């Protein structure tokens, strides 16, 4: 499933794997020839990755001659979309939860912008600082300022705290049916002796009265046997809040029976990963006719660029 998950160029890659002879015959074997026939570049104003200001960016963003492209691809592919399959899955309601940046976050975003300017102008050696480091720090900052520095204050209106409020309220409302929730964060996974949003969320929920045994980290299930046991507990409702990353809790996670809410605490790099996350709850076998997917974003940070 999902052969085109991140970039439109993946369609070309799939055709090279499956239809090399066809591409050769039609003189489309080189990417430039294929792209000029089936792709259209568009220039749009988008947020700069460091979170400050805007920039014009040209991207390969639209398919062109789409019926002709699909006719060629269908010689090797039998395509079924979720709409065509009409599977008995719950209706998903999406909610964007926006947190305002703190003064500290604003200052740090400005620092990221200054670092990016130095990198772009070549004023700093790439081994010392580069855009990968800057975007990595930007993602951490967008999630919680304490990941950058654990001594910074825990802001009551941060997106982590907004998420905790949400999880608790849904947990409380779903007590009778023992409804369950998934929380996704690819950053700040649990590690000994280091600040982690996983531990922070768990401790805050416990302090509000959620039993510790009803909260689990996917990282604690480090074997297939333990994973199966954990998923069985979520399906039965004995574990009601499961926190994990896309890599460990994406494809292959089958615990949808009582899932009522999914929380995207951070935004993964690839659009296909968001689909994988959503596929855990929008799934056959879920007893709820409607489910909720919450996406948390910190305004004016790298978060906004990613989403």
For each predicted feature, which ranges?
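Conserved Helicase C-terminal RecA-like lobe
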Residues: 87-249
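Protein kinase-like catalytic domain
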Residues: 18-19, 171, 235, 282
């Amino acid at each position: 499933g999902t052969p085109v998950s991140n970039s439109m160029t993946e369609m070309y890659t799939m055709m090279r794997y499956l239809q090399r002879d066809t591409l050769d015959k039609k003189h489309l074997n080189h990417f430039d020839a294929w792209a000029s026939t089936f792709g259209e570049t568009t220039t749009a104003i988008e947020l700069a990755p460091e979170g400050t200001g805007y920039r014009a960016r040209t991207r390969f963003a639209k398919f062109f001659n789409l019926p002709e492209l699909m006719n060629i691809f269908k010689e090797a592919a039998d395509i079924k979309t979720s709409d065509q399959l009409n599977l008995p899955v719950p209706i998903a309601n999406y909610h964007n939860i926006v947190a305002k940046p703190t003064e500290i976050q604003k200052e740090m975003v400005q620092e990221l912008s200054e670092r990016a300017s130095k990198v772009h102008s070549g004023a700093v050696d790439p081994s010392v600082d580069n855009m990968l480091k800057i975007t990595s720090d930007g993602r951490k900052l967008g999630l919680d300022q304490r990941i950058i520095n654990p001594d910074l204050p825990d802001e009551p209106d941060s997106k982590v705290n907004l998420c905790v409020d949400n999880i608790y309220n849904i947990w409380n409302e779903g007590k009778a049916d023992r409804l369950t929730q998934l929380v996704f964060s690819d950053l700040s996974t649990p590690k000994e002796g280091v600040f982690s949003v996983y531990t922070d969320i768990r401790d805050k929920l416990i302090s509000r009265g959620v039993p510790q045994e009803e909260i689990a980290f996917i990282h604690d299930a480090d074997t297939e046997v333990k994973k199966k046991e954990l998923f069985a507990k979520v399906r039965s409702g004995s574990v009601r809040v499961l926190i994990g990353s896309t890599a460990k809790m994406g494809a292959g996670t089958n615990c949808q029976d009582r899932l009522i809410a999914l929380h995207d605490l951070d935004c993964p790099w690839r659009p296909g990963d968001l689909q994988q996350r959503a596929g855990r709850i929008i799934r056959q076998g879920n007893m709820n006719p409607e489910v909720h997917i919450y996406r948390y974003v910190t305004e004016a940070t790298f978060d906004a660029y990613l989403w």
